[in-house]
Each structure stands twice: as structure tokens, then as C-alpha cells.
């Protein structure tokens, strides 16, 4: 991650580097006015193959900004492979989550190493399998990756093949809340459970619903 919003003193701006390509998101009007300059600076510093604008954030509408998905410099392939810790991961910058991949969780994925060996792992809200693949590579006996998106699970399976762990990674397409209740009723047990749900509260008005969701 090249720029991480407030953490780097640039609220509303995220810039991620995937192999030799960059992807960015702008969430506020102030930085939108500096977009062309931003692209010029990124191109000068990194000399990337391409830079992709992933400005399809719903929050942009609150600032009167359009939804944009476009290559704004060079060329960006439909898919590319990145290296994250011991894993290789397929990334689709144009249609993947956020800027193409949840890079903000890469440190946590690396922290699975001492906990995964020999365990049966349940990865809830797995998206494209970042946690699942790392758990398998770190020696998990089995990994069940669960997500409501079959498109995301298809990428989990491809990532499992890419990393040589397809024999220990299975996928389940289901609503996580429903499946968790079902598994609890069945008395299923896992040595390691990972849950990385989407944001429940994207605005103050959603707080009550978020509290209910987290409790559930």
C-alpha cells in the first residue's frame, strides 16, 4: 500500500501497488481536484506499466462526484499475479474489491503462520481467499472458504490451484449468518475460525444495524 488515507496524512486517498501496476481511489472533492497531478506524480515516481482509477465508491456520490473505473495511464491487464508473504494471488484491478485486493489485511494474513498448522480452518467472508490460501500454505489440515459471492469463490479456487493447495481448500457459497447458525446447531468445531466481514456501518445512521450484525 503506497498511500493509506488518514494514516499517511491524505484523507480520502488510497493508492495500492500490484506488481508493476498502480490502482487508486479518491473519496473526497478536495483530492479529486488534484487527480491529474496525482497521476503525474505516481507515474514519475514508480514508472508503472499502468495506473487504474477505481473511483466507484458510493461515498463519492455524497460529494457530487461521478463513479469512474478507467485506466488513466499506460495499460493495466485484466488480471495479474502478486506475491504476498508465501502466497501468489490473482488480482483483478478493474473488478476486484476496493482497489483490486484487500492489501490492508496483508499483515494479518501473515500472522496466521503460528496458528494454522494442523488445524481445520473456517474462513468466513473469505472474498478471493487471502486468508484461506495463507492458512493452507502455513500447514492447515483443511480450509473451508465461505462467501456469498460465487464469483469470489471461483477466484479462491483458482488461487488454491495457483499455490498448489487445492486438495485442502474447499469453497461454500452461502450467507455467512445463516451458515454460522447451521454449523453451530450441528455442533461443528474448527481449530481456527477467521471472520473478515464487510463494513456494517458506513454511516452514523447504520450504527444500530451494525451493533446487531456484530452481536449475531
Task: List the predicted regions and their residue ranges.
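Short beta-strand/turn micro-motifs composed of small residues
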Residues: 26, 55, 147
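Non-catalytic substrate-recognition/targeting regions of SAM-dependent transferases
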Residues: 3-16, 32-101, 110
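Rossmann-like S-adenosyl-L-methionine
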Residues: 74-216
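Short histidine-centered catalytic/ligand-binding loop motif
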Residues: 23-32
Amino acid at each position: 500500500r503506497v498511500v493509506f488515507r488518514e494514516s499517511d496524512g491524505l484523507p480520502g486517498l488510497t493508492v495500492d501497488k500490484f506488481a508493476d501496476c498502480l490502482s487508486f481511489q479518491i473519496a473526497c472533492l478536495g483530492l479529486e481536484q488534484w487527480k491529474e497531478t496525482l497521476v503525474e506524480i505516481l507515474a514519475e515516481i514508480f514508472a508503472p506499466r499502468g495506473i487504474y482509477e477505481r473511483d466507484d465508491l458510493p461515498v463519492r456520490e455524497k460529494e457530487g462526484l461521478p463513479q469512474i473505473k478507467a485506466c488513466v495511464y499506460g495499460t493495466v491487464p485484466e488480471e495479474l499475479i502478486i506475491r504476498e508473504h508465501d502466497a501468489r494471488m490473482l488480482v483483478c484491478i478493474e473488478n476486484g474489491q476496493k482497489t483490486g485486493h484487500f492489501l490492508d489485511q496483508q499483515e494479518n494474513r501473515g500472522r496466521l503462520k503460528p496458528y494454522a498448522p494442523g488445524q481445520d480452518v473456517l474462513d468466513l467472508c473469505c472474498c478471493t481467499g487471502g486468508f484461506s490460501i495463507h492458512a493452507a500454505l502455513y500447514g492447515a489440515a483443511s480450509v473451508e472458504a465461505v462467501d456469498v459471492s460465487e464469483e469470489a469463490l471461483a477466484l479462491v479456487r483458482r488461487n488454491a490451484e495457483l499455490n498448489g493447495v487445492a486438495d485442502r481448500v474447499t469453497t461454500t457459497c452461502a450467507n455467512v449468518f445463516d451458515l454460522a447458525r447451521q454449523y453451530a446447531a450441528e455442533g461443528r468445531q474448527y481449530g481456527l475460525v477467521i471472520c473478515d466481514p464487510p463494513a456494517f456501518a458506513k454511516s452514523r445512521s447504520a450504527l444500530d444495524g451494525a451493533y446487531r450484525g456484530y452481536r449475531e
